[in-house]
Each structure stands twice: as structure tokens, then as C-alpha cells.
Design a protein with these regions (language model features):
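Expand to "…catalyze enediolate/carbanion chemistry for C-C bond making/breaking, isomerization
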Residues: 1-300
Length: 300
């Protein structure tokens, strides 16, 4: 996984061609903004959106937001997008319709070349892969380990359900979401998303239910298409205060155990082994990331 910090609880899609949405994106409370060149941009306006994206990214970065960009699919002009949008303001590229590890490697190679040509930090632009076809499921492990630049993966629920001829429901999407989460964890990258349609932004009780399922699966954040979804994602993907307290206490006891030469120890009635420690470390890293982003937005 690249050095880009990627514990984003909420990633809000904003059409790259709609200036009024871009101007207010920093007010929405999302951890990151995804300037979209794909589904939300009409074909006739894609070229204009592509040209406008670098300036929009710089504007949003200056306002304290982490900025990503979703390019078009590789078959739909995605490589041309990369040639225009790659800039110091871009934290990561969201790659839609990933069907194979080769898709990831092709984009990673282009980014490596562009970083070198433009004097950008090597590996500074990460990748997030969207899995949007049932045919990609058998290749999840290959995709997840395709490049050190890959930060995480997410199921694209709408297109995925079309490919599988099924309804976009928590019951139908739980299984494939779990497969994505498992593949991410095996590869050491982060799983994003929740098992439901992201288009249902008015049904907040259903959203809460689906995001709670995602949290139980180990997801760390999710994409959203409407500002109304942001607060729910931020709340439910934030570590609870009691969990933060538990993790801090556990790590303090770990330090004591090491100082005393103890290899194993118990904390609050439970034996602690390396996986428990790793989970506590990730939880505290997520907590610190959310505090940093809150401070950055307050500063701006």
C-alpha cells in the first residue's frame, strides 16, 4: 500500500463539470471529494470536465479536502483522462470497472511515467479500484495485489447488480461485499463501501443499517453521491469513544508487558495476541486520521 493516507470515512462524488457543486464541496463535511469524470458527466461535456479538473482539485485541496478523481473506464477514455488530470493536488485515482489485475497495472504504469515527467512525488497518487462486474469476483486477489499504488477496493453496487441480474439490496450485496473485504485484507489494502445501493440517499434509516453491516465487515469508509449521506458515514465509520479508550489501554498494557519481558498478557479478561494488537493499531490510526481531517477543515 502506498504512503498516501487513505482512512477516508466518506468520499463524496462531485461532477467535475458542475462548478457550483465544486465550490461548495468543502462545506459538505466529507473526508475526501471525488471529482467525477465518469457516470455523472454527460458524454458531450467529458472533455471540458477533464480540462477543468486540475484547477478544481487545486482549489479543493487549498480548502483542506483530500481530492481524488474518478476517471472513465480504460475502454472509455480513462488513459486520456490521466494525461490531463495528474497533478500535485490529486491524492488518488478511482478506477472504475476493474476486471483484472492488468487494468490496475496499466494505470499504475501511466501514473509512474507522469509523476516522473512532471516532477511529482513518486507513488504520491494512489489508486482505488471499483469492482463492478460479477466476472471480476474470481480475480479479486490478483486485483488487490496488482500494484503497491493500490490503496483499496470497493464494490460498485449498481453496475455489479446489473451484471449479476439481481436487486441492489443488503441481502444480495452482503456476500460479494464480504469477498471484496476479505481480498483487501489478504492483500494489506483497505476495503471501502457498504452492501446496498448508494443511490438511495433519502432513506437514512436504511443507510444506517447498511453502513453498520459494512462496519461489521471491516469496511473503513464508503463512497457517497449526496451530501445527506456524509454525516451517517462519518458517524458510523468513526471508531466509538469506548473502542478508542480500549485500544489505548491495550497498547499501554502491551508496552508494560514488553518492558517486563512478558510475551503474552491479558487485558480486561482477554488474552492479547498479535491480531488483536494490529486491530487496535488500525483503529487508533483511523481515529487520528479523522481528527486530523476535522482540524484541517476547521482551519480553512
Amino acid at each position: 500500500m502506498s504512503g498516501v493516507s487513505c482512512f477516508w470515512r466518506s468520499l463524496l462524488f462531485v461532477p467535475a463539470h458542475v462548478e457550483k457543486f465544486i465550490d461548495r464541496a468543502h462545506e459538505r463535511g466529507a473526508d475526501a471529494c471525488i471529482l467525477d469524470l465518469e457516470d455523472s458527466v454527460p458524454l458531450a461535456q467529458k472533455s471540458m470536465a477533464r480540462q477543468a479538473l486540475p484547477a478544481a482539485a487545486a482549489k479543493l485541496q487549498a480548502r483542506g479536502l483530500d481530492v481524488l478523481a474518478r476517471i472513465n473506464s480504460l475502454q472509455g477514455g480513462g488513459l486520456d483522462d490521466l494525461e490531463v488530470i495528474s497533478s500535485p493536488s490529486l491524492r488518488a485515482v478511482v478506477l472504475p470497472k476493474v476486471g483484472s489485475a492488468e487494468d490496475v497495472r496499466v494505470v499504475a504504469a501511466v501514473l509512474e511515467r507522469l509523476e516522473l515527467e512532471r516532477g511529482l512525488a513518486k507513488g504520491g497518487i494512489g489508486l482505488l479500484a471499483q469492482i463492478e462486474d460479477v466476472a471480476a469476483l474470481p480475480r479479486l486477489d490478483e486485483i488487490a495485489s496488482a500494484s503497491p499504488r493500490l490503496l483499496g477496493m470497493s464494490l460498485g453496487p449498481e453496475d455489479f447488480c446489473v451484471s449479476a441480474s439481481m436487486e441492489a439490496l443488503p441481502e444480495t450485496l452482503f456476500g460479494p461485499s464480504q469477498q471484496v473485504a476479505f481480498a483487501c485484507r489478504r492483500a494489506g489494502i483497505l476495503p471501502f463501501g457498504y452492501p446496498d445501493s448508494i443511490a438511495l440517499f433519502t432513506d437514512l434509516p436504511r443507510l444506517r443499517h447498511s453502513v453498520l453491516l459494512a462496519r461489521q465487515l471491516g469496511m473503513v469508509g464508503a463512497f457517497c453521491i449526496h451530501p445527506a449521506q456524509v454525516a451517517v458515514l462519518n458517524e458510523l465509520f468513526s471508531p466509538a469513544s469506548e473502542d478508542v479508550e480500549y485500544a489505548e489501554g491495550l497498547l499501554a498494557e502491551l508496552a508494560n508487558a514488553r518492558a517486563e519481558g512478558r510475551g503474552a498478557f491479558a487485558y480486561r479478561g482477554r488474552m492479547v495476541d498479535p491480531p488483536v494488537v494490529a486491530r487496535a493499531l488500525e483503529l487508533l490510526e483511523r481515529h487520528r486520521a479523522s481528527l486530523r481531517r476535522l482540524a484541517a477543515l476547521d482551519h480553512h
